[in-house]
């Protein structure tokens, strides 16, 4: 028995691949990885001991491109699919799991060509174009969101790494705010952090700001101009995000699915700013259920004024009829919403099929 994991591009997809790879390793099952040279795949897995072999193809996404660029991208995908077909055959792969993203294309189609059972994890509340096409052909589609076309869909807990649960805690007071721009940075959140930093630091609230590598020097300059560089923990990215989340009492974040569920597992109340240009507005739908259950605050990017942060802080500090702060209630309920061992459930479901 040997698995192939494929997909990625961004940290959200790749964190799922990592969680599944860790579970496969725990169960003594060998796995290989197939991704792309474009995006973050190599950064995450080029030297990862979780995989016996790692392959990266020259592929790019097809969505939101001009006609001629789409043709070029499709050609690269097809070329890589035939390479992947030989790789899967060479390694005698018995199961393929796609975590989505354009880099999942070649190995997913190669699995179908080789008649290898294909399993998909759909991370978002709205399916991406590749998964919409592949879902009917897959053995099973795992997701933490309920889809209308039930078919071969399996509702499971999100495959969050156990460290997010291990570092969870119940929040009782807002002393530390985390501005989380995501793996690619987020200009709107970076600006929101800068605008709020003077008032927050004046109130004695600590700030950790993960701004993305492209914005790091610029953010450093602006904080220095404000005289706040020594009062703000500023990072381009952070290798130990679980520890960063653990220290925070409130987070401001994009609404990529992995971030949403990792914050949930950590019990960290969050203001979500969905990326307005995400395909099919999927980031908004990723947190819609949370918003309906009063487990988060959602602010559209075009309404992101500095006062919004302090409005949310006031609401979180309010108490219910039992004398409990909304902050504490939300933190507790978030930890109850997601079950541990989502990755284990997915792997065991596949093995029992």
UniProtKB/Swiss-Prot annotation:
Example of a GO MF term: undecaprenyldiphospho-muramoylpentapeptide beta-N-acetylglucosaminyltransferase activity
Residue ranges the record marks as coiled coil: none
Subcellular location: Cell inner membrane
GO cellular component, one term: plasma membrane
Keyword Heme: no
Membrane topology summary: Peripheral membrane protein
CDD domains associated with the record: GT28_MurG
Keyword Cell cycle belongs to the record: yes
Pathway: Cell wall biogenesis; peptidoglycan biosynthesis
Record: residues binding UDP-N-acetyl-alpha-D-glucosamine: 10-12, 124, 183, 283
Record's catalysed reaction(s): di-trans,octa-cis-undecaprenyl diphospho-N-acetyl-alpha-D-muramoyl-L-alanyl-D-glutamyl-meso-2,6-diaminopimeloyl-D-alanyl-D-alanine + UDP-N-acetyl-alpha-D-glucosamine = di-trans,octa-cis-undecaprenyl diphospho-[N-acetyl-alpha-D-glucosaminyl-(1->4)]-N-acetyl-alpha-D-muramoyl-L-alanyl-D-glutamyl-meso-2,6-diaminopimeloyl-D-alanyl-D-alanine + UDP + H(+)
Major location category of this protein: membrane
E.C. designation(s): 2.4.1.227
Enzymatic class: transferase
Any GO BP annotation: carbohydrate metabolic process
Gene3D superfamilies, alphabetized: Glycogen Phosphorylase B
InterPro entries xref list: GlcNAc_MurG, Glyco_trans_28_C, GlycoTrans_28_N
NCBIfam families: murG (TIGR01133)
Family affiliation: Belongs to the glycosyltransferase 28 family. MurG subfamily.
Role: Cell wall formation. Catalyzes the transfer of a GlcNAc subunit on undecaprenyl-pyrophosphoryl-MurNAc-pentapeptide (lipid intermediate I) to form undecaprenyl-pyrophosphoryl-MurNAc-(pentapeptide)GlcNAc (lipid intermediate II).
Protein's name according to its UniProt entry: UDP-N-acetylglucosamine--N-acetylmuramyl-(pentapeptide) pyrophosphoryl-undecaprenol N-acetylglucosamine transferase
Organism of provenance: Helicobacter pylori (strain Shi470)
């Amino acid at each position: 028995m040997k698995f192939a994991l494929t997909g990625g591009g961004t940290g959200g997809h790749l964190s799922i691949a990592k969680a599944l790879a860790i579970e496969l390793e725990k169960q003594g099952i060998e796995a290989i990885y197939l991704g792309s040279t474009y995006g973050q795949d190599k950064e995450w897995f080029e030297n990862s001991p979780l995989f016996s072999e790692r392959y990266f193809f020259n592929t790019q996404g097809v969505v939101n491109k001009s006609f001629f660029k789409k043709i070029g991208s499709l050609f690269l995908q097809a070329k890589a699919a035939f390479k992947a077909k030989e790789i899967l055959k060479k390694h005698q792969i018995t199961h393929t799991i796609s975590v989505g993203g354009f880099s999942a294309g070649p190995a997913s189609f190669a699995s179908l060509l080789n008649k290898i059972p294909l399993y998909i994890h759909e991370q978002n509340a709205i399916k991406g174009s590749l998964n919409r096409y592949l879902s009917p052909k897959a053995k099973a589609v795992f997701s933490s969101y309920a889809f209308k076309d039930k078919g071969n869909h399996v509702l499971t807990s999100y495959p969050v790494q156990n460290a997010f649960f291990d570092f969870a805690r119940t929040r009782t007071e807002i002393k530390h705010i985390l501005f989380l721009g995501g793996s690619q940075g987020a200009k709107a959140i970076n600006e929101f952090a800068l605008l709020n930093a003077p008032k927050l630091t004046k109130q004695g609230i600590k700030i950790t700001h993960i701004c993305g590598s492209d914005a790091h020097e610029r953010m450093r300059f602006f904080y220095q101009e404000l005289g706040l560089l020594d009062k703000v923990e500023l990072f381009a990215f952070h290798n130990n995000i679980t520890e960063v989340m653990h220290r925070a009492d409130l987070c401001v974040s994009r609404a990529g699915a992995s971030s949403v569920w990792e914050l949930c597992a950590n019990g960290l109340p969050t203001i979500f700013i969905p990326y307005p240009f995400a395909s099919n507005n999927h980031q908004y739908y990723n947190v819609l259920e949370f918003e309906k259950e009063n487990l988060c605050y959602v602010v559209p990017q075009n309404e992101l004024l500095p006062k919004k942060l302090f409005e949310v802080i006031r609401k979180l500090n309010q108490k219910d009829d039992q004398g409990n702060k909304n902050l504490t209630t939300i933190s507790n309920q978030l930890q109850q919403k997601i079950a541990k061992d989502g990755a284990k459930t997915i792997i065991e479901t596949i093995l029992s099929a």
